[in-house]
Amino acid sequence: MYMKITKIDGVSHYKKQDKGILKKKWKDLDERKQREKIEARYNKQIESKIYKEFFRLKNKKRIEKEEDQNIKSLYFFIKELYLNEKNEEWELKNINLEILDDKERVIKGYKFKEDVYFFKEGYKEYYLRILFNNLIEKVQNENREKVRKNKEFLDLKEIFKKYKNRKIDLLLKSINNNKINLEYKKENVNEEIYGINPTNDREMTFYELLKEIIEKKDEQKSILEEKLDNFDITNFLENIEKIFNEETEINIIKGKVLNELREYIKEKEENNSDNKLKQIYNLELKKYIENNFSYKKQKSKSKNGKNDYLYLNFLKKIMFIEEVDEKKEINKEKFKNKINSNFKNLFVQHILDYGKLLYYKENDEYIKNTGQLETKDLEYIKTKETLIRKMAVLVSFAANSYYNLFGRVSGDILGTEVVKSSKTNVIKVGSHIFKEKMLNYFFDFEIFDANKIVEILESISYSIYNVRNGVGHFNKLILGKYKKKDINTNKRIEEDLNNNEEIKGYFIKKRGEIERKVKEKFLSNNLQYYYSKEKIENYFEVYEFEILKRKIPFAPNFKRIIKKGEDLFNNKNNKKYEYFKNFDKNSAEEKKEFLKTRNFLLKELYYNNFYKEFLSKKEEFEKIVLEVKEEKKSRGNINNKKSGVSFQSIDDYDTKINISDYIASIHKKEMERVEKYNEEKQKDTAKYIRDFVEEIFLTGFINYLEKDKRLHFLKEEFSILCNNNNNVVDFNININEEKIKEFLKENDSKTLNLYLFFNMIDSKRISEFRNELVKYKQFTKKRLDEEKEFLGIKIELYETLIEFVILTREKLDTKKSEEIDAWLVDKLYVKDSNEYKEYEEILKLFVDEKILSSKEAPYYATDNKTPILLSNFEKTRKYGTQSFLSEIQSNYKYSKVEKENIEDYNKKEEIEQKKKSNIEKLQDLKVELHKKWEQNKITEKEIEKYNNTTRKINEYNYLKNKEELQNVYLLHEMLSDLLARNVAFFNKWERDFKFIVIAIKQFLRENDKEKVNEFLNPPDNSKGKKVYFSVSKYKNTVENIDGIHKNFMNLIFLNNKFMNRKIDKMNCAIWVYFRNYIAHFLHLHTKNEKISLISQMNLLIKLFSYDKKVQNHILKSTKTLLEKYNIQINFEISNDKNEVFKYKIKNRLYSKKGKMLGKNNKFEILENEFLENVKAMLEYSE
């Protein structure tokens, strides 16, 4: 049973309302009619079937455009046989059998291998090549009608019919296997407690196996292992051995192995004495062989078919073939263990799904009240769990920030009492002094009453604690409570946050700053320097600030709109796109700054004004769709490009449907349309849809700008500076204060709780979470016909609070006056004897002391004593990565030599009565040479000069980033992403753990069930405090359930190894420690026994030994994450004596490459030194 419901042309599966049985829709149709509908759908996809099973067309052409009549005739000949429908597109005389061997033109697929039979029936073997030969020899020169009457043709037709029928039978069987064949049964008539009843053989088999494992828990040997030992595949492996010893040609080996597999499976299927469990086991064997012997795998492992030797070595590896005295032998024990592991994996996934369905049936209001459980409902479960993992990541970041306030991480700091030491009169937790770091999170914390600081800190602590418990408990967030000490009784009592006047007052104060913050955002983007007061006033007569912005799926973000607008303007200087005209990226600095300002003004209009208006005007949207199509066609005609017709195949818009539904539907249809092409072609064709949607929104946005003359100034070019004397420019912002108060209620404890929580997390993280919330909201609205809350909280509240936090959060960057700088630095750093020694000591970790001794920019102000705050670098301190990164950077500090190199670049000489630095001269030279290239007037020598200039500019940029510690910040971002990813994986493991416990609970004795219930829903502790489910409690609870521990752990840890030790009652603390190491970010804080990030990845892979997909994703996600930073990483496997696979970095890290002028001229985006930094960070341990 999979958490997926197969759907083919309307055949879906759902839960029957009256009995809770999950079975096929179309319950009134008999099996024959169901098969007819599936066959009709299959025939509609026949083109993709032929491509997949028989053909790979050269240069990815479609068959209709194929000029070679050999290829075309063969294709349509097969199509007629496959569909059993006549077509007039083939001539037998055009088919040349030699093309069957041309690997560049036709590749035979799964049932269609070189010199291997195509179909077998009893003892008869049908070779496609022989059948073709017989037909061609007899009637090659005859017309189609005579060919169709020929015996050999009719034989082929019959074979294809059997072939297709077998495919459809397998598909129907797959549907039956993939549907959820379960029945809920009430464990207790009076309570909503459910168990599971299977309703088909496959589910019954797994159900009975699970029951047997749990009930026979006192057996000495694992029941599962004992059953697997009885599944003997020795004879099959011996036959495979013979093939590898007798054959050398790769396609013959593949074909014969697959034939042997089919014979073996068929024999076992016909042998009714084999039990159902063994049949499932044989299917796992079949999947393993077919996957690794597929054309797709051959292509990937042989470098696109260029080196079959590499693929042959791969096959030997996955078949565990060892060379002994020049004879190839399969290590049968290793191979058997591999299939055993895959079978166990499948088994555990079924158990997980049992538990997951039971949990949601009992606890989720939507699933509990759902009459028919369909695909969309399972998608809802999956989407909700993904969002829960995202929020678990935020909890770890928030808790880490809280730790950074106190400097302590041992134990659980959340929800613990904050005390005030009477001796030192400072805030303390344990023995660690609380430093004044509140400024990092609550900028004006002086407004808090000094006597209330302890209560405020407790409020922050409990705000995180409450969210953590809600995420861990899976149901809903119970927010707004905290505990404070009662003065009279000296006991801690529970209190509502809306009764905390300090927090409520601060919230009201920040809410009142929204208008000022919006103004500051515009002023910080320098609009007052590039636009006159009149133009600014015109702009703000139009602009309307929205704290809750509307979003829809697939709508392009503004970065894509800008890029599309720039590209289309540069195409023959099309005046329609004047709002997006760009200067050369290497033009004068002031022009680049102007573009930033103009684009910011456009972006604010795009999200706040345009979006809501555009999505509400269906008639206008309809016209724009037609306009975009016509314009694309015209551009294609002018440039004589066939791409001009790419938009014509996309459906027009019908005003009867919502705009968001239309955009979603054209994406979906395009994915279905390109299904018939290979993967590379899918990516190319899917891009047409993205381009189409981008042009629709771009055209709509331009129309919006054009209709209001007050905004026409935004297409004007920059000429002179305005207000260059720093004159204050004032303007009014259109803000609906009542609407803001409607969302941001100071008397709502939940709102205050989430506000404190989000305030402890970096803006980037909460912004990413907001995007995930929007996807969740859009999914529930579209698929479930109603917007769902998330953990009991409306999505709009999350969105509004996150926008509020990001907007009103103070930026820790350099201020406009040195007096304000000094004030800010005084709050952030300890001042000792009129010197900022703490600041200097931190800088020494990353910068050579000789550089700091002069106390100059960019680290100190002009008074040579006041520190300059580097905002991004400050984040490493705020979020606790600074200490760890200083260890990584100890051998890569910014040096005196690098400073001298920057000074050389910045040396100025007088040129044409203007002083220009060396770097400015290089930038001017690059612009000049680039213009020559655009005019086709550049020489080869000048191209080389251009590329050398580019390298020097890149070197300068790297040195400047290093000087300003941007490289450290980039490492901080990368490290944070890796830590977040690990938290998400561990949260999934904890969820799986809980679901498995739920699944096995129904098989336990009543006494043990009570213990499990206590484990899943712990009672309040002795102090009356609510205790929530936690995997870390396992050591003290589950081990008390008689006999369950060993068998249970054998299900989760299939290899019985973790951190190179056996999991048993005595050392459960090992993996509990690893869980805490990940969840509490101990990697940043422990002074010794650090587990490297690569080792963490390996341990996570071991932890998910029961889920191969997740194991693969752990590795892949590491690569994907680093690719985001332009880093390419390769792994290799080292195998220790205990046969525990470990991945390590292969050789070194590599930078992605950027393009330069000239053919094949590229440069590495990242410097080697930075790549070494990243490698050191990934491998660092103590």
Curated annotation (Swiss-Prot):
Its EC number is 3.1.-.-. One of its GO terms (molecular function) is RNA binding. One of its GO terms (biological process) is defense response to virus. It is an enzyme of class 3 (hydrolase). Its cofactor is a divalent metal cation. Residues 132-279, 896-955 form a coiled coil. Pre-crRNA processing is metal independent, while crRNA-guided target RNA cleavage is dependent on divalent metal. The keyword Iron does not apply. Signal peptide: none annotated. Disulfide bonds: none annotated. Target RNA acts as an activator for non-specific ssRNA degradation. Residues 366-508 are annotated as: HEPN-like fold 1. Residues 965-1120 are annotated as: HEPN-like fold 2. Keywords: Antiviral defense, Coiled coil, Endonuclease, Hydrolase, Nuclease, Repeat, RNA-binding. InterPro entries: Cas13a_endoribonuclease. Can be used to detect RNA or DNA with atomolar sensitivity and single-base mismatch specificity when combined with isothermal amplification, allowing detection of virus, bacterial pathogens, to genotype DNA and to identify mutations in cell-free DNA. Additionally the reagents can be lyophilized and reconstituted on paper for field work. Belongs to the CRISPR-associated endoribonuclease Cas13a family. NCBIfam families: cas13A_C2c2 (NF038188). The target ssRNase active sites are probably within the 2 HEPN-like folds, and the 2 folds interact in vivo. CRISPR (clustered regularly interspaced short palindromic repeat), is an adaptive immune system that provides protection against mobile genetic elements (viruses, transposable elements and conjugative plasmids). CRISPR clusters contain sequences complementary to antecedent mobile elements and target invading nucleic acids. Unlike many single-component effectors, this CRISPR-Cas system targets RNA. CRISPR clusters are transcribed from pre-CRISPR RNA (crRNA) and processed into crRNA by this protein. Cleaves linear target ssRNA in a pre-crRNA-dependent fashion, preferentially before U residues. Part of a type VI-A uridine-preferring CRISPR-Cas system. This is CRISPR-associated endoribonuclease Cas13a. The gene is cas13a.
